[in-house]
Amino acid sequence: MAAKDVKFGNEARVKMLRGVNVLADAVKVTLGPKGRNVVLDKSFGAPSITKDGVSVAREIELEDKFENMGAQMVKEVASKANDVAGDGTTTATLLAQAIVNEGLKAVAAGMNPMDLKRGIDKAVINAVSELKQLSVPCLDSKAITQVGTISANADETVGTLISEAMEKVGNDGVITVEEGTGLEDELEVVKGMQFDRGYLSPYFINKPETGIVELENPYILMVDKKISNIRELLPILEAVAKSSKPLLIISEDLEGEALATLVVKSMRGIVKVAAVKAPGFGDRRKAMLQDISILTAGTLISEELAMDLEKSTLEDLGQSKRVVITKDTTTIIDGSGSKKDIKNRISQIKQQIQESTSDYDKEKLNERLAKLSGGVAVLKVGAATEVEMKEKKARVEDALHATRAAVEEGVVPGGGVALVRVAQKISKILGQNEDQNVGIRVALRAMEAPLRQIVSNSGEEPSVVTNNVKDGIGNYGYNAATDEYGDMIKFGILDPTKVTRSALQYAGSVAGLMITTECMVTDLPKEEKSDLSVPPQGGMGGMGGMM
């Protein structure tokens, strides 16, 4: 086992603090509308330029192992805030730095670290409940645009694009961000339920010019098994032929005689039919077939439920306005399922997402949720160079997360104002002793840090602006982009409550742990021994006798 280097007390805390400050100072320059860029060196290719706090934090590794521990703990704050709310990483880092700096000063002055931590925790709990009181719902597209714009570093086109996407696919819809091919940002929306399964035979194609199958007002048969015998399908095919509507068959597989007969019937015009495989595998396939049956108001024919395909009737079939099938995808548009049933199914899937522990399962459940909710939107980011493209894509993803967070928990006035107002409201709370009171004051002072940093990055005097904001009430704050004071909500400067809340909670949690640190242990660096057995380099080895 390698030898360890151990540091105690103040010596350990000073080293840790140095690491915290290096990381936080690099991250905080990106905060606010006039935040600066950070250039990150890459081992290959051009350096990347970013204004995204978490991207900067992830790049930082320090040579001194004790300092690096401090930096890594703050990095954890940024990553946690990013995972939960998708944004607020810079705010979280800044809050953690402010609490740690003030807290360690108090420890050095002889305060009890445990009581300081209790005071900080008490202030954070009270601040979070006040934030919830201050929060207002974010429901209209104007507010969504504003939140997206602020999070994308005042890029209005991004805010508008996200708002449009949410309007088209609903707040639960899936919105993905991709690198575009042009200079302009684009929005592409796939309406209805789409899954990755194409037609089983090209002979089903009825639109040869585009190579797709299009069915208007079709019946939809969903079967949870492999079909190879045409006899099982004959009764339902006859019933559909009489109704003169097209039919889509979704099954585990369709092969042999059954597929050949369907192709012949389709080509002769006896019945307009198309067949596709069911999406997914195993239990997920059953669940997705169930989703389709709810969306189209049909019944899933399943042998597990002792249902017989031969005995199925038109009542068992689902219906939709239109179905479009390509080589690789099937899209069911405007299914005739009842809104109430679909809503219940969505609630059920949301519950499963909350209970799921696997990221992969969560991702798949979210996909199902989106397909039921009304579609998928793809934001294609345009830029002139690859460096700009990567930077912009990261900003758009941040803005998208922030907007989702805003819809979920509402918004508070932005620009650091919400935390200042919350700190004013809880300024009278007291702990059980004087050391806890100091902890509370440390947290309250730290809540001013985001506003001070936004002002500092815009080139103004932080103390003057902070005092002016404190003298105001409600949403009154400072707009760093235009250098004016006023109502932050009217300025359109909004922060999602979830982002501000999680930044404060994680910063308070990790900062409390750092203040109560008394000992740090790390591996001693290995000394590289010089190898004395290597002969002096005086020429080519083995050729001494030729001289």
From Swiss-Prot:
GO terms for biological process: protein refolding. Residues 538-547 have a biased composition (Gly residues). Its main location: cytoplasm. Keywords: ATP-binding, Chaperone, Cytoplasm, Isomerase, Nucleotide-binding. GO terms for molecular function: ATP binding; ATP-dependent protein folding chaperone; isomerase activity; unfolded protein binding. It comes from the Bacteria. InterPro entries: Chaperonin_Cpn60_CS, Cpn60/GroEL, Cpn60/GroEL/TCP-1, GroEL-like_apical_dom_sf, GROEL-like_equatorial_sf, TCP-1-like_intermed_sf. Its EC number is 5.6.1.7. It is an enzyme of class 5 (isomerase). It catalyses: ATP + H2O + a folded polypeptide = ADP + phosphate + an unfolded polypeptide. It is found in: Cytoplasm. Forms a cylinder of 14 subunits composed of two heptameric rings stacked back-to-back. Interacts with the co-chaperonin GroES. Belongs to the chaperonin (HSP60) family. This is Chaperonin GroEL. It comes from Buchnera aphidicola subsp. Tetraneura caerulescens. The lineage of its organism: Bacteria, Pseudomonadati, Pseudomonadota, Gammaproteobacteria, Enterobacterales.
